[in-house]
């Protein structure tokens, strides 16, 4: 038995196919979803989406949103998504360093919040390409 996974960003259908299992980062922690999962709606955190397809794990970086699970269908609406295979590890690490510097320099509540979000996004991209996350 499989699950139908659809990941949507504002600009495109990012993923639309059958999968065996997923592990999704939510605001209350990671959840594993297998066929016949209890129906739920949840917020999606800036974090990693792991997809098991044909016995192998794929890793993606998700940039926050919402998910609906029910009847062996998962619909994930996110601000942005990126496959680990599309991320340049060196560029991702440089982005973290820039985001950390911007976070340290941030003044005022709004700047600190925006800098923190940018840092979370940058760290998620690095995590998506780390050997432990990729799961080869």
Curated annotation (Swiss-Prot):
Alphabetic keyword roster: ATP synthesis, CF(1), Hydrogen ion transport, Ion transport, Membrane, Plastid, Thylakoid, Transport
Xref: SUPFAM superfamilies: Epsilon subunit of F1F0-ATP synthase N-terminal domain
A single cellular component GO annotation: plastid thylakoid membrane
NCBIfam families assigned to the protein according to its UniProt record, in alphabetical order: ATP_synt_epsi
GO molecular function, one term: proton-transporting ATP synthase activity, rotational mechanism
Superkingdom of source: Eukaryota
Protein family (similarity comment): Belongs to the ATPase epsilon chain family.
Main localization category: plastid
Subcellular localization: Plastid thylakoid membrane
Topology class, membrane: Peripheral membrane protein
UniProt function note: Produces ATP from ADP in the presence of a proton gradient across the membrane.
CDD domains assigned to the protein according to its UniProt record, in alphabetical order: F1-ATPase_delta
Subunit structure: F-type ATPases have 2 components, CF(1) - the catalytic core - and CF(0) - the membrane proton channel. CF(1) has five subunits: alpha(3), beta(3), gamma(1), delta(1), epsilon(1). CF(0) has three main subunits: a, b and c.
Gene3D superfamilies: 6.10.140.480, F0F1 ATP synthase delta/epsilon subunit, N-terminal
Identification of the protein by name: ATP synthase epsilon chain, plastid
């Amino acid at each position: 038995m499989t699950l139908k996974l659809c990941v949507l960003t504002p600009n495109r259908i990012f993923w639309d196919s059958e999968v065996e299992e997923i592990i999704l980062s939510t605001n209350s922690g990671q959840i594993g979803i297998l066929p016949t999962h209890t129906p739920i709606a949840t917020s999606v955190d800036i974090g990693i989406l792991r997809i098991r397809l044909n016995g192998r794990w794929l890793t993606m970086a998700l940039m926050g949103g919402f998910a609906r699970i029910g009847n062996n269908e998962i619909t994930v609406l996110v601000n942005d998504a990126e496959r680990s295979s599309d991320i340049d590890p060196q560029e991702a690490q440089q982005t973290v360093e820039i985001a950390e510097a911007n976070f340290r320099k941030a003044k005022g509540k709004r700047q600190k919040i925006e800098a923190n979000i940018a840092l979370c996004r940058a760290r998620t991209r690095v995590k998506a390409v780390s050997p432990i996350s990729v799961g080869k």
